Amino acid sequence: MRISCAIVFCVFTFCYLYFYQADILVLTQHLASNGQTHYVPFLGAILITLVLQLCQIGVNSLLKLSKRGYALTYFPPVLLLTILTAISSDVTTSITFGVWAWLAPLLLILYVVLVLYVRHYEPYEPEVRGVGFISRLLWINLGTMFAFFLFVGMFSNSDKHFHEKVKVEVLVHNHKYHNALRAIQQMQNVDSSTTMLTIYSVARIGHLSDSLYEYCLVGGNDVLRPGKVHSLLLPDSVINKATKNSIHYQLTGFLLDRNLPKFTRFVTKYYPVDSIRPRYYAEAYKLHTLLTKGLTPKPPYAKGSYTHYYFAKK
């Protein structure tokens, strides 16, 4: 029974940390250490799982529960696991315990009262029949374990949008720009900071002037560089240093704000001949020419085109 509970706990904890909360823990450690240390998902999941299992062994050595209440010795490590992955979706620059600052001590007090009660009456429990996987004792304890796992799922961070956003942050931070852009395309909603990382990623792969508007963009020129928005992982200085002298960033800023008159004045300095202008620059220049003549392109506008972005709801 003890071995079965340990296996179930370790498998759940490792899978939960490695497959579901890995990106969240990367962000948590980054903020907690002020960017001085980096969380490695596979190694971190193994180490945290081992530490939590050792915590359970320590708790059981004190309580010495061996019957129906044995699985209760897993509550302290389950509580630690929950708090570790309960980072707020509104986090910006630092980690706070929030409600857990008072809720965790309260739960531990209630836990101590419960286990003392269980320990007091454990000698009087009737023997449970069955051995191995047909043992009633095993399934009672596994039921308690599953209730604990449900507790983890309910009170840790399970915000889908936040998970998607942090995944993009981690991929960009690790220079996996193509993967980040694929993740962004799968997001149902994007915010201004994700838009900034979208522009940065497209620029890093060299397609700012021919594929940027295939992605959802919000915020206009304000999200081009850090200022009003910031990345959770990537320092502002990294983005600014990589883009401060970029002609494409300057022209893209005009296009994001739909400022075609200013765009046309600058684009002719860098691309005087229409035939050498990249896709969006040529399209925007032609669009400006039509608009100055009082003409408007007929909808529908092709998705991924600058014209579609220009006439989209502002």
What is each PLM-predicted segment?
Residues 1-76:
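Membrane-anchoring hydrophobic segments
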Residues 13-19, 76-87, 146-152:
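Aromatic-anchored segments of alpha-helical transmembrane domains
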Residues 31-32, 64-68, 120-135:
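Membrane-interfacial, low-structure loops and terminal tails that flank and connect transmembrane helices
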Residues 71-128:
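Membrane-embedded alpha-helical segments of integral membrane proteins
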Residues 132-159:
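Internal/C-terminal transmembrane anchor helices
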Residues 157-264:
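Soluble catalytic regions of membrane-associated enzymes that act on cell-envelope
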Residues 241-314:
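Solvent-exposed soluble domains appended to multi-pass membrane proteins
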